[in-house]
Amino acid sequence: MQPPRERLVVTGRAGWMGMGRGAGRSALGLWPTLAFLLCSFPAAISPCKILKCNSEFWSATSSGSHAPASDDVPEFCAALRTYALCTRRTARTCRGDLAYHSAVHGIEDLMSQHNCSKDGPTSQPRVRTLPPAGDSQERSDSPEICHYEKSFHKHSAAPNYTHCGLFGDPHLRTFTDHFQTCKVQGAWPLIDNNYLNVQVTNTPVLPGSAATATSKLTIIFKNFQECVDQKVYQAEMDELPSAFADGSKNGGDKHGANSLKITEKVSGQHVEIQAKYIGTTIVVRQVGRYLTFAVRMPEEVVNAVEDRDSQGLYLCLRGCPLNQQIDFQAFRANAESPRRPAAASPSPVVPETFPYETAVAKCKEKLPVEDLYYQACVFDLLTTGDVNFTLAAYYALEDGKMLHSNKDKLHLFERTRELPGAVAAAAAAATTFPLAPQILLGTIPLLVLLPVLW
C-alpha cells in the first residue's frame, strides 16, 4: 500500500488538492469542482483570501520538511486544522463566495474521513529555503523531472505537440485542428487536465449585440512535485499582467521553480508563459480591448485527464457544443447578398459594421491566404465593426506559426467548399425532368438552402 506521503504527492500531480487514494470518492470529487470555482472567482479581484489558504494547505501537505511522513495522521490533521483556521479568518470577506464554501465543506469531509478532532494542535508554517544570492527568478539547477523534453527523451521518442487557439468573436482552433466559430457567452473551460486549468469568459461586444469576445482569462498551474507551486494567472480587458496573481514570475520556492516562467514580450499587449515541466508554451495577447489565447502542448499532457467522461466541456479538446456553434458559411452567404432596406420598426442595438467588400479588403491586407483565419476576420468585421479584430486574426495565425508542430496544417480551409458545385449539378439534373414550372420554382429555393442545411 502506498504511504500517505506518496499518495499526497501523486494526487498533487493529478488534481487540485485531493488527498490521494486514501480519501473517499466524495472528497476526490470535490477538488475538481473547487478548481473550476476558483477559476470563476479568483482571489486576484476579490478580498476573499481562500486561494491563499488553499496554497498554504497544499504547501504543508505536498513537499518539504513539514510534509506528513508515512502514517503521520496527526500531522495531517494538524494541517487540516490550520486550513480550517485560515478559512475562518477570511470568512467575513468570503460571504457568498462559492469557492470558499466548497473549501469549508471539503475540510469537514476530510476531517471526518481521517477522524481528526476539531480541537488540537495546528501545523507550523512551512520553512521556506532562501534562494541563492542574486535574483531568485534566475535559478537554472532544476531537477530533470522539471524539464519535460529531457525526461521524455530518456524513455521514448520525441513527444508529439498539438496547438489550440481562441480569438475574435470567438473562433476556436482545437487540438485536433477543427476550426469553429462559437457563441459560448459567459465562462467556459478551454483546458481541464491533471496539470492545468484554463477558463475564459466571453461577453457581448456591445449591449444588445450577439457578437461576443474574450474579456477575461484565468490559468491555473497545479502544484507539481518538486517543480512548481500552484500558480494562478489572470488577465482581463485592459489589464494584461506580467506576473502571476501572487506577484511572482516563476513557479515559487521549489527546487525546479524556474521550469515555470512568465515573460512580458510587449507591455500590456503580449505575455508568454513557459511551463517546461509539462512541455507547454502559452501566449496571451490583448488586441484592442479583448484577449486572445494560444497554447502548444504535448499530446500526453492534453490527454492527461482522470475522468474522460467529465471532460465534455474541455473546449480545446472537444470543441464547442453543437448548440453553441455558429454556421459561419451561412452568415457569409447572407452578408454577400445585397442588403435589404432598413425596417421601419425599432430593432435591437447592433454595432455599426463594415460593408462586406470593405471587410474583405481590410482582411486581405493582413491575411492574403483565404483560409479560415481570413474568413474569421471577415466574419468579425461584419459582426462587430471593430477593425482590431483584423489584428486578432492576424496574431492568432502568427501564434499558430510559432506553436503548431506541423507547418503543413497551419492554414485550414473550409471542408465543404465543394458543396456549391454539387448543388449546381443537382440543379442542372433537375431541369432535365419535365416538371411543372410551379414545382421547379418550389425546388430551386430548397437547392439554394442545401449548403446551409448540410
From Swiss-Prot:
Polar residues composition-biased segments: 114-126
Pfam families tied to this protein: RGM_C, RGM_N
Chain positions listed as propeptide in the UniProt record: 48-169, 428-454
UniProt PTM comment: Autocatalytically cleaved at low pH; the two chains remain linked via two disulfide bonds.
Annotated spans, Disordered: 114-141
Single GO term (MF): coreceptor activity
List of glycosylated residues: 115, 160, 388
Location within or outside the cell: Cell membrane
Keyword Lipoprotein belongs to the record: yes
A single GO cellular-component term on record: cell surface
Keywords carried by this UniProt record: Autocatalytic cleavage, Cell membrane, Disulfide bond, Glycoprotein, GPI-anchor, Lipoprotein, Membrane, Signal
Lipidation residue positions, type GPI-anchor amidated alanine: 427
Bridged cysteine pairs (disulfide): 146-227, 164-316
Domain of life (superkingdom): Eukaryota
Gene Ontology process terms (BP): BMP signaling pathway; membrane protein ectodomain proteolysis; negative regulation of axon regeneration; negative regulation of collateral sprouting; negative regulation of neuron projection development; neural tube closure; neuron projection development; positive regulation of membrane protein ectodomain proteolysis
Tissue specificity note: Expressed in gradient in periventricular layers of the developing nervous system. In adult, expressed in scattered cells throughout the brain.
Site positions for Cleavage: 169-170
Membrane disposition: Lipid-anchor; GPI-anchor
Residues of the signal peptide: 1-47
Record note on quaternary structure: Interacts with NEO1, BMP2 and BMP4.
Similarity section: Belongs to the repulsive guidance molecule (RGM) family.
Biological function: Member of the repulsive guidance molecule (RGM) family that performs several functions in the developing and adult nervous system. Regulates cephalic neural tube closure, inhibits neurite outgrowth and cortical neuron branching, and the formation of mature synapses. Binding to its receptor NEO1/neogenin induces activation of RHOA-ROCK1/Rho-kinase signaling pathway through UNC5B-ARHGEF12/LARG-PTK2/FAK1 cascade, leading to collapse of the neuronal growth cone and neurite outgrowth inhibition.
The protein's name in its UniProt record: Repulsive guidance molecule A
